[in-house]
Design a protein with these regions (language model features):
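Glycine-rich phosphate-binding loops of nucleotide-dependent enzymes
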Residues: 2-261
Length: 261
């Protein structure tokens, strides 16, 4: 874990007793955990454990049925994704939310488009595409994300390249917390290694904070500082990397080991 986290005693994120019901279905049952600045937290659990629901609550897609979320010690009530984005929480979902007909730069700037200067540019809303493409190329290069060109349409790229662009967009704009839902699911071995290294480097050199959802326990154990395990909507364990192993994590996921709470 980055040493930066140890100097700030207020957790970046505190989730307290979050519940969520959909009709008669109780998707989350009193989930609580903290995330320090500069940490990578892996959120793991079997299908239907509540991982995606919890992430959607943190990112403002769903309101919790009950419970509180604190960001930098401040109570937050995100009633829409835009509110979470404004607070600095960026999320990359499995569907990536890329527009295939747009080029790389337009996707990176989606919803944050830059217009040309001057009265005409501002009045007519003319996009400053040269500036957007230049900034996109610089930003992705700094993140060591390799793409053919920022002018290339996303539909012409591989699944791995699309995933890298979606992650790059989140990293470009995220200021507080980056949530990655299965970030390596569509990637080959080399691209997976590239993404894992990028996440580690951004934590270690920039003090960025991540929540990563993944079913790949080897990847989880490699990059995570802390692992939060959900089972059937309940928080059953929080495990520090240096105090656990892959076998123990899997045991909590499957129920072979009882809840630690």
């Amino acid at each position: 874990m980055s040493s930066q986290a140890s100097f700030d005693h207020t957790p970046l994120l505190r989730v307290e007793n979050i519940t969520k019901t959909f009709g008669a279905v109780q998707a989350l049952r009193g989930v609580s955990f903290t995330l320090e600045r500069g940490e990578i937290l892996a959120l793991v659990g079997d299908n239907g454990a509540g991982k995606s629901t919890l992430v959607k609550i943190i990112s403002g897609v769903y309101p919790p049925t009950s419970g509180q979320i604190y960001l930098n010690g401040q109570l937050c009530a995100f009633d829409r994704p835009a509110a979470a984005l404004a607070a600095g929480i960026e999320t990359v979902y499995q569907n990536l939310a890329l527009i295939e007909e747009l080029d790389v730069a337009d996707n990176v700037y989606l919803g944050r488009e830059t217009t040309r200067g001057g009265l005409v540019g501002r009045f007519l809303g003319i996009l400053d595409r040269p500036a957007m493409r230049q900034h996109t190329a610089q930003a992705l290069n700094q993140l060591h994300i390799k793409i053919p060109a920022p002018t290339l349409a996303v539909r012409r790229m591989s699944g791995g390249q699309r995933q890298a662009i979606a992650i790059g967009r989140a990293l470009t704009w995220g200021r507080e917390l980056l949530i990655l839902d299965e970030p390596t699911a569509a990637l080959g071995v080399d691209e997976t290694e590239q993404v894992l290294r990028m996440i580690e480097e951004l934590r270690d050199t920039r003090g960025l904070t991540f929540i990563v959802i993944s079913h790949n326990m080897q990847n989880v154990y490699r990059i995570a500082d802390k692992v939060v395990v959900l089972r059937q909507g309940r928080h059953v364990a929080t495990l520090r990397k240096e105090e656990t192993n892959v076998e123990e994590i899997v045991a909590y996921i499957t129920g072979a080991r009882e809840s630690a709470f």
